[in-house]
């Protein structure tokens, strides 16, 4: 999963307006190829948590479950979009991540909402943001990790974009 964070950082560097991004682009593409080669388990149609390992516990939220949606969270260009949708649907059904169950791991994992944003899952993303607002914004319960707040902000931005697209699509269909 850390490899996806590195990939995303390099991707963002490419977009940052630097003059020469050729070396960055080459490194990012190599990492992308290695992520696909090492972590995609084609036989079992899932992402591995450790390269070339059959370790997998479908009832474990972290790392096993989260690994299935981590490529979505970091906007990794997954080749098999239908397979990724199946993994996302299984993750959502199995773990109900939008409820922000802190008891599960001691951590909110608000970042899972980015997977919903990538899948266009407005309902679950709205539920996540609503649960976050209800549980953590009223009294600013400690600890409010800045990382969690940051993910919520990014997810709200994505949600805004999803609503914009939905409105534009609706108007086009009505015209």
Which stretches of residues belong to each language-model region?
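CBM-like carbohydrate-recognition segments
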Residues: 39, 60, 72-175
């Amino acid at each position: 999963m850390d490899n996806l964070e590195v990939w995303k950082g390099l991707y963002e560097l490419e977009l940052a307006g630097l003059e020469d991004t050729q070396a960055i682009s080459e490194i990012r593409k190599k990492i992308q190829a290695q992520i696909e080669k090492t972590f995609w388990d084609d036989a079992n149609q899932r992402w591995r948590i450790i390269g070339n390992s059959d370790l997998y516990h479908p009832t474990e939220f972290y790392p096993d479950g989260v690994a299935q949606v981590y490529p979505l969270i970091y906007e990794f260009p997954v080749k098999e979009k239908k397979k990724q949708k199946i993994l996302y649907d299984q993750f959502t059904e199995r773990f109900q991540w939008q409820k922000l169950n802190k008891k599960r791991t001691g951590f909110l994992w608000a970042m899972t909402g980015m997977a919903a944003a990538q899948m266009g899952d407005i309902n679950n993303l709205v539920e996540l943001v609503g649960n976050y607002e209800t549980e953590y914004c009223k009294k600013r319960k400690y600890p409010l990790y800045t990382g969690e707040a940051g993910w919520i902000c990014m997810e709200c931005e994505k949600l805004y974009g999803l609503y914009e697209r939905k409105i534009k699509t609706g108007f086009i269909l009505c015209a």
